[in-house]
Every structure is written in structure tokens, then in C-alpha cells.
């Protein structure tokens, strides 16, 4: 990259890197995906030897990877055409031929992958519906469940893939499914991965449940589940051995997710989202105490606990590109290439929508005084959230002299169940009211020029 390119283009071209995962039995062996080559490809690295390499080289790009438990093979989901339909492939960690990982599984859309000693589980959807396959002791995979409604391996939807599917000893498999409701309000089902028999189920009518992470202790049948019985997402521990359900006592505003356990199963790694900014905590299960983990404000894209108790996380900020860090603040993996030019900071912002609601969002401005021409940049979903997170497109508009307003309108996540579900049966009304109210507020603040306003997203 050359300094002669404008800052906005350099931001788009700066390589990005995911948070590395590691092999459970060989934690020095890492897997991650990066855009060093121009599109996302899977990479591996060995912390013990310093060796590393790019594993995939596919024109469509490869965004999902994992390591086998022993670290001898790297697994990746390859989509040949960009349709997102593909297969899991395996390649030796040190290099060699890539071959389909699970025999007996046809091409489809990725529904998650989980591994435990002696068992592998994979979710696949195709034109015929949604299915779950398991391979026992390396044998060809068998279909153990199929349905017409969404079924995914636990952890996929929670962002904790590899931790929320199979219990540590492989005796239980958690699935998130919509057989009783819909995509927005899934239930959690636990089955025997060898027979497909139902062990237990949790269903909250009109509310969402998602499996997050199993205890790492073999034989421990405690599963962290995310629920929204109090309005905001909250973690609970479901003990499949006893049936006991324990809600975590957390005096925090906004969604809270438990994303991993410490290796001795004494504490949970918790991510708290407070109005579009995340904070990591350690939650001690015995005393029920919460301790903040120090880091800069921003958005935590992923976080996990290393076998030695260190915490790794991926942090993004509106004005700084994402970095993969340890609790000490050191980078755990860094892509080759120049760092992205710093952008302008996101400003947290509230306004009244004229219908009795207080709406939250962020805005960004160029240097100097307004009013500026403005882009009201609307997130998709609608079940999504604008957070204090790096976005080269937003910074490009700011470089061109525009202010950018981002509104977490009714229908967005991050502000409770009722706020998210407000658009059900009423698409095209409340969200437009909120975005327009946000524009009016920015005009009133002197940030935006009402005669030079556009909408995008």
C-alpha cells in the first residue's frame, strides 16, 4: 500500500484478521482468517515454532475455519460459487491435499460444527430442509435429525462455535431450533449425538433461547444458555444432570452474554453490551461476583479463555480498525501490511422519536463546525445494531465532508426483547419514524444540514 492513495481507500485495503481459535489438545496451534491476500482466507500459525501459512486460496474467499482436537488438521468451510453452499474440508496442519471432512454429508448451507472425543456434529441445510449429522469414531456421518424449520448446532448463532454444541465428553449435543416458533424466538434442544434421542428441551414461548457454551470439564453437564425472560438477554446455567436452571445475578443495563468458561469451570467470561459498546467481565460462579477486565471501549467481536486462563478478544472501535488482543493488551496475531489510517470517533447519542420513545444511536462528523451534509446510514436486519465499530464506508463518507447518523431504530437488537420485536407485523413504519426523528435531531443540534441529507445502508 502506498501513501499516495487517499485515506478512505487505504482503510478499505488494510488487511483484517479474526480472533484466532486453537486446537483443544494442542493450544499452541492456531487458526484464523485474514484478508492479507485481498479476500478472506484461512491461515494457521504455530506459537511454539513461529511457523505459519495461508491454508486456502479460493477466489470466493473462505470465512470459517477450525482445528481438529489434536491440531493435526485444519478444517474450513468452502463455498465454490459464492452461494454460501459448500462442504467442510480438512487439510493437514503442515500442508497437503484438502479432502471433504465428513463422509456421508451432502453439500448445503453451514449450520455449525462441533467436536468432542469420538464424535463430530455438523448442521447442514438444503432444499429439503435442515439436518444434523454426527460421525462417531471417524465413521461416515449419519443424519440424526431433520426438520422443515431452522436447526443449527449450538453456539453458531451465539458466536461461540465450537463451545456450544457438544459437551466436553461428547455425550450431549445442544441444538438451537425453531420447530416450535420462528427464527427470532428459537428454543434449545439437547439430544444424544449417537442416537438422536431427545434428552431435554427448553422452550420460552414468544422469547429467544440460545445455547452458548458447555462447561469444559469432562462429565460436567452444565450448559450456558442465553435467555430473555427479563427483557434483555441474560445468561443462565442449565445443568442437564439435575435439570436445575440457575440465572446469573447481574446488575447490568443491557444485554449480557457468557461466551466461555475458565478451564477449571469456576468462572465465566461475560460480554456486556451497553448502548453499542462492550465490556468484558469475569463472573465467579461461587460468590457470584463480577470483575471487569480492563480494555478500551468499543465492540468485542469475539472473546475466549485460553487454557492458561488468559483472555483473548477482538476489539473494534469506530475510529480504529479491529485488533486481536490478549488481556495484557498485546496483539496475539497481526496481519501483514500497513495499519489503517485512524478515522473519526463515534459519538453516542439519544433523541426522542416523537412517539414517547428514547432512541439511541451514533453519529460521526468531519473535523470543524457543522452543519454538514449528512448520510443517515441505516443498518440491515432489521434485527441488527449499530455499535462503536470500525466501518471503512462510514469513514469514507466523513472524509468526503459528510456527517453520518446511525440510528438503532425500533426493531434493532441490543435494547431488549420488546424493542427488537416492535416491527413484527408493522414493517415500514416505526423504523422510518425513528430514522427521520434522528435526522431532525441532528439538524437541531447543528450537526446536519436538512437541505443536504441522503439515506443509505
Model region roles, listed by residue range:
Residues 2-370, 382-400, 425-427, 432, ...:
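Peripheral, non-catalytic segments that deliver or gate enzyme domains
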Residues 359, 373, 452:
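Alpha/beta-hydrolase fold active-site loops
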Residues 377-380, 396, 406:
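Structural cue for short, hydrophobic secondary-structure segments
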Residues 401-416:
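Conserved alpha/beta-hydrolase
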Residues 447-457:
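Alpha/beta-hydrolase fold nucleophile elbow
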